[in-house]
Every structure is written in structure tokens, then in C-alpha cells.
Amino acid sequence: MKLHELQPAAGSRKVRNRVGRGTSSGNGKTSGRGQKGQKARSGGGVRLGFEGGQTPLFRRLPKRGFLNINRKEYAIVNLDQLNAFEDGAEVTPVVLIEAGIVKAEKSGIKILGNGELTKKLTVKAAKFSKSAEEAITAKGGSVEVI
């Protein structure tokens, strides 16, 4: 085998389709755009959601709800995730981010009661569910709303 004899693997390199190069090429004359009309012209085409003048779907459907600009979205942490910390540790939002349990604090961190807590911890967060608060205090830990 010589350097000039090297060939790419079969089917690994697709040949570019050259349009408008004669009718016998299969893509001549209209270049795969069909006959005349808006879509055959250069820069032609209809805008997104246009249905030929018929009332588009997004206008036929009723409006629903609104977006509250003052909404608060909390980063959620479950009790079983808190078992990653050592017994007697203080768990704060900064510690949770450093440990990789939470990506971003958002409007604060909310602790939920899914799973089982096996360690005594001091947990500081923006919100707690009742079950989470009870589980933390039952293990001898403490809860602090910040």
C-alpha cells in the first residue's frame, strides 16, 4: 500500500449535490424547487406559522394563564441527598453548590422530605417542607430559615 493509493471508507464521504447543471443531472432547470411560485423564488418562503391566509392554529386556540413576573423558583434538595454530608455538619446554600448537589441557588433552596435522613445536621435554607423539618429535628439536627 502506498500513500497515493489510500481511499476513504465506502460511504464515509457524501458527494455534494450540484443543482441547476442540466436536465439529465436530475436536478437541473428548477433545481428541485418545483414549478413557479413564492417558494421557487430566491429568498421566497412563508413566515413561521403561516397557513396560507387561514387563521393559524396559535390564533384559533384560546389564551390561557399568565406569567407572574414576581414568581420565585426554588432549587430543590431532598433529604436523602443530605446524607452526603458528615455527621454534625452545617449545610448551607454555599456548601450545597460546592458539593454539586445544587447547580444554582435561584430564589433560594427548598428542602423536601423525600428519602430518609441518617445523620444529625444543621440545615440552613430558604424553605422547608413540614416532613423535611420533622425528619431533621427527629435526628437531633436543627433547621434555620435564611
Curated annotation (Swiss-Prot):
GO CC terms in record: cytosolic large ribosomal subunit
Top-rank lineage group of the source organism: Bacteria
A Pfam family the protein falls into: Ribosomal_L27A
InterPro entries: Ribosomal_uL15, Ribosomal_uL15/eL18, Ribosomal_uL15/eL18_sf, Ribosomal_uL15_bac-type, Ribosomal_uL15_CS
Keyword Oxidoreductase set for record: no
Gene Ontology biological process: translation
GO molecular function, one term: rRNA binding
PROSITE patterns per the UniProt record, alphabetical: RIBOSOMAL_L15 (PS00475)
Region listing for Disordered, in residue ranges: 1-51
Keywords: Ribonucleoprotein, Ribosomal protein, RNA-binding, rRNA-binding
Biased composition (Gly residues): 23-35, 42-51
Role according to the record: Binds to the 23S rRNA.
Family the entry assigns: Belongs to the universal ribosomal protein uL15 family.
HAMAP family documented for this protein: Ribosomal_uL15
Subunit text: Part of the 50S ribosomal subunit.
PANTHER family recorded: 50S RIBOSOMAL PROTEIN L15, LARGE RIBOSOMAL SUBUNIT PROTEIN UL15M
Designated name of the protein: Large ribosomal subunit protein uL15
